[in-house]
Structures are given as structure tokens and as C-alpha cells.
């Protein structure tokens, strides 16, 4: 029976060891394992959230880039249209200025031509009167002179 008492003593010692381990050793180990599992799970969730945030940020950046390109294209088109409009306006203004200058020059030429004609008429009338005076050897009075000049001027 010695063996039974030894076996009983070992069983009691083993039971006390198991109880001691369950009471004092097992809870901190289980707590450490659970803390580690929670930490790993939180890390995985954070990584998943970060990946989703990254995907969202990349999508937003892509959308913003597309929007910026579209806006830039619109601005370039507007600038080109404005450039063409400014060029057309400048051409129209230049054409109007050219026409104005030509009209003014033609008017000046016409005025100068009329002045030259009047001057020439006066000279021709004066020469005609001088010639007529020499032919007639007499002087024409002022009223007759004026009538003759007006008549000759009108005919010329």
C-alpha cells in the first residue's frame, strides 16, 4: 500500500499544483495572451482602415487631378477664345481706323482739289480780265468785273 499512499500523496500534490497554477499562474498568462490577441486584432483593423483610407485618398486625388485637368482645359479654351476675340476686335478697330484715315485723306484731297480749282479759276479769271482789258484797252468797273468773274467761275 505504500504505493497507494505515495500515489495518493502525488495526486494530492499534483492537485495542489494544478490549483496553484489555476489560481496564480494561469490568469496572468491567459490575460497576456488575450491582450496580445486584442493588440494584434486592433493592429489588423487599423491596417485595414489605413488601407481603405489610402484607397479613398487615392480616389480623391485622382478625381481632383481629373477636375484640375478639366478646369485647365476649360481655361485654355476660354483663353484661346478670348485671344481670337481680341484679335478680331483689333482687326475691326484697325479696319475702322484705316477707313477713317482713308475717308479723312479723301476729304482732304477733295478739299485741296477744290481749293486748287478755285484758285485756278481766280487766276484764269484774272488773266482773262487782264487779257480782255488789254484787248479792250479799258478798265471794267467793279460790279461788271464781279459779274464777269462769277460767270466765268460758274462756267469753269
UniProtKB/Swiss-Prot annotation:
GO MF terms held by the record: proton-transporting ATP synthase activity, rotational mechanism; proton-transporting ATPase activity, rotational mechanism
Similarity field: Belongs to the ATPase B chain family.
Chain segments annotated as transmembrane: 7-29
GO cellular component: plasma membrane; proton-transporting ATP synthase complex
Keyword Transmembrane: yes
Topological category with respect to the lipid bilayer: Single-pass membrane protein
Organism encoding this protein: Vibrio cholerae serotype O1 (strain ATCC 39541 / Classical Ogawa 395 / O395)
InterPro entries: ATP_synth_B-like_membr_sf, ATP_synth_b/b'su_bac/chlpt, ATP_synth_F0_bsu_bac, ATP_synthase_B_chain
Keyword set, alphabetical order: ATP synthesis, Cell inner membrane, Cell membrane, CF(0), Hydrogen ion transport, Ion transport, Membrane, Transmembrane, Transmembrane helix, Transport
Main location: membrane
Subunit composition and interactions: F-type ATPases have 2 components, F(1) - the catalytic core - and F(0) - the membrane proton channel. F(1) has five subunits: alpha(3), beta(3), gamma(1), delta(1), epsilon(1). F(0) has three main subunits: a(1), b(2) and c(10-14). The alpha and beta chains form an alternating ring which encloses part of the gamma chain. F(1) is attached to F(0) by a central stalk formed by the gamma and epsilon chains, while a peripheral stalk is formed by the delta and b chains.
Its job: F(1)F(0) ATP synthase produces ATP from ADP in the presence of a proton or sodium gradient. F-type ATPases consist of two structural domains, F(1) containing the extramembraneous catalytic core and F(0) containing the membrane proton channel, linked together by a central stalk and a peripheral stalk. During catalysis, ATP synthesis in the catalytic domain of F(1) is coupled via a rotary mechanism of the central stalk subunits to proton translocation.
HAMAP family, sorted: ATP_synth_b_bprime (MF_01398)
Subcellular location(s) per record: Cell inner membrane
Pfam families with a match to the protein in the record: ATP-synt_B
Record protein name field: ATP synthase subunit b
